[in-house]
Curated annotation (Swiss-Prot):
Record keywords, A-Z: Cytokine, Disulfide bond, Glycoprotein, Secreted, Signal
Gene name of this polypeptide: IL10
GO BP: any one term: negative regulation of interleukin-6 production
Broad class of the protein's primary localization: secreted
Compartments it resides in: Secreted
Summary of subunit composition and partner proteins: Homodimer. Interacts with IL10RA and IL10RB.
Recorded family membership: Belongs to the IL-10 family.
Cleavable signal peptide: 1-18
Protein name: Interleukin-10
Residue positions the entry lists as glycosylated: 134
Organism: Marmota monax
Keyword Signal: yes
Disulphide-bridged cysteine pairs: 30-126, 80-132
InterPro entries xrefs: 4_helix_cytokine-like_core, IL-10, IL-10/19/20/24/26, IL-10_CS
Amino acid sequence: MPNPVLLYCLVLLAGMGTSQGENTQSEETCTHFPGGLPHMLRELRAAFGRVKIFFQTKDQLDDMLLSESLLEDFKGYLGCQALSEMIQFYLVEVMPQAENHSPDVKEHVNSLGEKLKTLRLRLRRCHRFLPCENKSKAVQQVKDAFSKLQEKGIYKAMSEFDIFINYIEAYMTAKINS
């Protein structure tokens, strides 16, 4: 039985009209992405480390925003959509507000956002990692809880960014191993 990853990349290349013997950026990204993932996750963790203490000391709430049900969505059939929606949530709703909480963290939050955008771009280039359409109820629960927390939601979401990185890692590890 052929390797499904190899088969998918071949179908992707054929669909793009790639002639035999040419290497495309998508093919390169798809082939090399799994090997570069640990480095990308280290970069995300290092960037978050620059703002972690700021946001975690301001987060005075005991309840978790990023729940176990979200991790289960990441690991299950909704993993693709959950990851895509959570990246969008952090980039559109959380980080722009987080940048405005202190001039000391603005540059670092911006850098963290750029690294997250780079990850999203690389995931999209290799469709194997983000081929999704369904909505995740767990992500909607995170968004609803975030909205209810109002200003405190920024501190909560940013203080749990390391958990989000762990969920990304769990999703990607499952995809790479499947």
